[in-house]
Amino acid sequence: MEFTLRQEALVNSSWEAFNQNLPLFSVLFYTFILEKAPIAKNMFSVLKDANEIPLANPSINAHTEMVFEMVRDAAAQLQTTGQVVLGDTTLGVVHTQKRVDGLHFMVVKEALLKTIKEAVGDKWSEELSNAWEIAYDGLAVAIMKEMS
């Protein structure tokens, strides 16, 4: 299945909405993850010693921005080449060290989609959701390949 220019545009425009309030959406993103998988807290160095998700924490914002930017980049790669190649091959090592598995990728995908839904409000659609899902899945597959 081809990733279309329209899908890439949907990811880009919704990423822009997300990026307009990065501190809020960073907290939401991690809140969604921890609601679903509280044990995942120890997998994130930025949360390990925190009792709650701190608002406007530069480390949390940077990590959240990196995750969403990698999905955005995956969308661009899927549109132009049909595959995702990691720019940072150490991601496989880091995810292996943290003992990330397929279920963790699913939890993060769900949190990512919920966060984008909050960011875009009434512009949320099945088409937008599908574009982010496909891009995220492409990124997840690339990371899992590096893990093996």
UniProtKB/Swiss-Prot annotation:
Q: Key word Phosphoprotein present in the record?
A: yes
Q: Where does heme b bind?
A: 45, 95, 98
What keywords appear on the UniProt entry?
Cytoplasm, Heme, Iron, Metal-binding, Nitration, Nitrogen fixation, Nodulation, Nucleus, Oxygen transport, Phosphoprotein, Transport
The residues that hold O2 are 63
Q: Which GO terms describe its cellular component?
A: cytosol; nucleus
What residue range is the signal peptide?
none
Q: Which residues carry this modification: Nitrated tyrosine?
A: 30, 136
**Gene Ontology MF terms in the entry:** heme binding; metal ion binding; oxygen binding; oxygen carrier activity
What Gene Ontology biological process does one annotation of this record name? response to abscisic acid
- PTM annotation, UniProt: Nitrated in effective nodules and particularly in hypoxic conditions; this mechanism may play a protective role in the symbiosis by buffering toxic peroxynitrite NO(2)(-). Nitration level decrease during nodule senescence. Phosphorylation at Ser-45 disrupts the molecular environment of its porphyrin ring oxygen binding pocket, thus leading to a reduced oxygen consumption and to the delivery of oxygen O(2) to symbiosomes.
Q: What name does this protein carry?
A: Leghemoglobin 29
Task: Point out the gene that encodes the protein.
Answer: LB29
Please give the chief subcellular localization of this protein: cytoplasm
Residues that the record marks as modified (Phosphoserine) are: 45
Cell compartment(s), UniProt = Cytoplasm, Cytosol; Nucleus
- Into which family does the record put it? Belongs to the plant globin family.
Its tissue distribution reads:
Accumulates in root nodules after inoculation by bacteria of the genus Rhizobium. Expressed in mycorrhizal roots in the presence of the mycorrhizal fungus Glomus fasciculatum.
InterPro entries (UniProt xref)? Globin, Globin-like_sf, Globin/Proto, Leghaemoglobin-like
Q: Which domain of life is it from?
A: Eukaryota
Q: Is Heme there in the keyword field?
A: yes
